[in-house]
Amino acid sequence: MSFTDPIGDMLTRIRNASNARHEKVLVPASRLKVRIAEVLRDEGFIKDFVRHEDGPQGAITIVLKYSGDREPAISDIKRVSKPGLRRYVPTDSIPRVLNGMGIAILSTSKGVMVDREARKQKVGGELICTVW
């Protein structure tokens, strides 16, 4: 099975599972997807994730996070840079998501990181997605 936008597929699976109040979601694995999952975990948007080495590609099980009244930790997650239109931003143009209430995930020359970290290290890069 081939996807035009594997990162967009991962984000859509997370959004749909979160809106349906599922406990877990399974996505095909890649190094970039694992790094995005690490950032989401470190920022408190997901509980945890586990990488499975099943088959040639493997998979990632993402455990979603909810508040006490079953409200999802992820209100929305949007893909910004797409295969048909890549969006690169310099350091001074990195957006602030909801005035700091959300995060922007960037792929930089120093790895995948959140907007706050990219500003601190003074690096720009490809704006993968925004989460709040």
Swiss-Prot record:
Residues annotated as transmembrane: none
Keyword terms, alphabetized: Ribonucleoprotein, Ribosomal protein, RNA-binding, rRNA-binding
Pfam families: Ribosomal_S8
InterPro entries found in the cross-reference section: Ribosomal_uS8 (IPR000630), Ribosomal_uS8_CS (IPR047863), Ribosomal_uS8_sf (IPR035987)
GO cellular component, one term: ribonucleoprotein complex
Tagged with keyword Transport: no
GO BP annotations, alphabetical order: translation
Gene3D superfamilies in UniProt: 3.30.1370.30, 3.30.1490.10
Function comment: One of the primary rRNA binding proteins, it binds directly to 16S rRNA central domain where it helps coordinate assembly of the platform of the 30S subunit.
Family as reported in the entry's similarity comment: Belongs to the universal ribosomal protein uS8 family.
Quaternary data: Part of the 30S ribosomal subunit. Contacts proteins S5 and S12.
Descriptive protein name: Small ribosomal subunit protein uS8
The species this protein was found in: Anaeromyxobacter sp. (strain Fw109-5)
